[in-house]
Each structure stands twice: as structure tokens, then as C-alpha cells.
Curated annotation (Swiss-Prot):
It comes from Prochlorococcus marinus (strain SARG / CCMP1375 / SS120). InterPro entries: APS_kinase, P-loop_NTPase. The active site is at 109 (phosphoserine intermediate). This is Adenylyl-sulfate kinase. Belongs to the APS kinase family. HAMAP family: Adenylyl_sulf_kinase. Keywords: ATP-binding, Kinase, Nucleotide-binding, Phosphoprotein, Transferase. Pathway: Sulfur metabolism; hydrogen sulfide biosynthesis; sulfite from sulfate: step 2/3. ATP binds at residues 35-42. It is an enzyme of class 2 (transferase).
Length: 201
């Protein structure tokens, strides 16, 4: 990584977050979905995106695969690259937060320390960690890309759940059994949590 740039100044937005939230009628928040590959993070994030959009809310999905096509296409899957991947996502999510958007991030984000760093970028009530809890067997049966099979065959190195660890959240804001519940139930659980926290109506 290059040295940190100097002689730069943060420019405050001409329209602040509070004004945007007041105009739109809802708060912005980072909803951070974490879990194994195949646990349903992207599926749930996108289904929730549709549900919130239908309510007239401003939302955006940051998906792990999509981000690696552009912003993070220079990163691999070593521990240090995973850390940098999540650091970048945390910063991007913070920008969306300031823009008054409900940002839905769907990343394996296997290490607790990296998720905690992302949380600490914003205020306590601005970050909601949701653990998509599905056991490894279920995740493997959902693997349409064949990634788990390749990992078990040694064709993919540093694959979370097989050759690289996943550190489960110790105290997530919400834990959903995405292995057994259908997508509508999962979406309803998240929306109920958002209502409970007065983030949406």
C-alpha cells in the first residue's frame, strides 16, 4: 500500500445527512450482512432492498462479488487482502450513510476484528450487524458456482469455511437462521428489527 496522502482537507457536504433524512422521512443506516458463502447474504440483502424500495426508502446494495469487479479488483483472498477489502467497503458504506441511504452490505467478512473496524467508522446506532447463520452443509448444497467443491479439491486456496476460518459474530444485532427459514421470513425479521430501532416505519 502507498503512504497516506498529505495536504488534503475533508470538504463538508452542502446538504447534510440530517437534512436529507428529514426530507426523505427515514434515517440512513449501514446494515452489514455477514456469513459463509452460500448462507444467503446477497439473497437477503437484495430481497430486503426490494421490500424497502417499495416503501419508498432510499437504499443500495453493496455486494461482495460486484465490489471485487471494480473497487477491489486488485485484491486477493489473503488475510491482509481481506482486511483491506473490508476497510474499503466500510469507507464506501460510510459515504452512503452520509448521503442518507440505507446501505445493505453483503460480504463474508470472516474476521471479527475487520467487522468491528467497519462498525467503529460510524456512530453506534448507524451500524447493524446481521449474522446469516446457515451451517456449512447447507451452504455447500446451495453452491451453484461449485466453489466449495473446488476448495475441497485444493483448487481454491484460502476459502472461508474450508481452508480459511470464519469467526462467527459474538453479539450480532440480529442472528437469522437463513439455512432453515424462507426468504420472506428473513426479510420480515430484518424489517421488524428496523422498526424496533425506529430506523423505518
Amino acid at each position: 500500500m502507498t503512504a497516506q496522502a498529505s495536504n488534503i482537507v475533508w470538504h463538508k457536504a452542502s446538504v447534510d445527512r440530517e437534512s436529507i433524512e428529514k426530507e426523505r422521512g427515514h434515517k440512513s443506516v449501514i446494515i452489514w450482512f455477514t456469513g459463509l458463502s452460500g448462507s444467503g447474504k446477497s439473497t437477503l440483502a437484495n430481497a430486503l432492498n426490494v421490500a424497502l424500495f417499495k416503501k419508498g426508502l432510499a437504499t443500495y446494495v453493496l455486494d461482495g462479488d460486484n465490489i471485487r469487479h471494480g473497487l477491489c479488483n486488485d485484491l486477493g483472498f489473503s488475510d491482509s487482502d481481506r482486511e483491506e477489502n473490508i476497510r474499503r467497503i466500510g469507507e464506501v458504506a460510510k459515504l452512503f450513510l452520509d448521503a442518507g441511504v440505507i446501505v445493505l452490505t453483503a460480504f463474508v467478512s470472516p474476521f471479527r476484528s475487520d467487522r468491528e473496524k467497519a462498525r467503529k467508522l460510524v456512530k453506534e446506532n448507524d451500524f447493524l450487524e446481521i449474522y446469516c447463520a446457515a451451517n456449512l452443509d447447507i451452504c455447500e448444497t446451495r453452491d451453484t458456482k461449485g466453489l466449495y467443491a473446488k476448495a475441497r479439491a485444493g483448487e481454491i486456496k484460502d476459502f472461508t469455511g474450508i481452508s480459511s476460518p470464519y469467526e462467527e459474530p459474538e453479539n450480532p444485532d440480529l442472528k437469522i437462521d437463513t439455512g432453515l427459514k424462507d426468504i420472506d421470513q428473513c426479510v420480515e425479521e430484518v424489517i421488524s428489527k428496523l422498526i424496533e430501532l425506529n430506523l423505518v416505519k
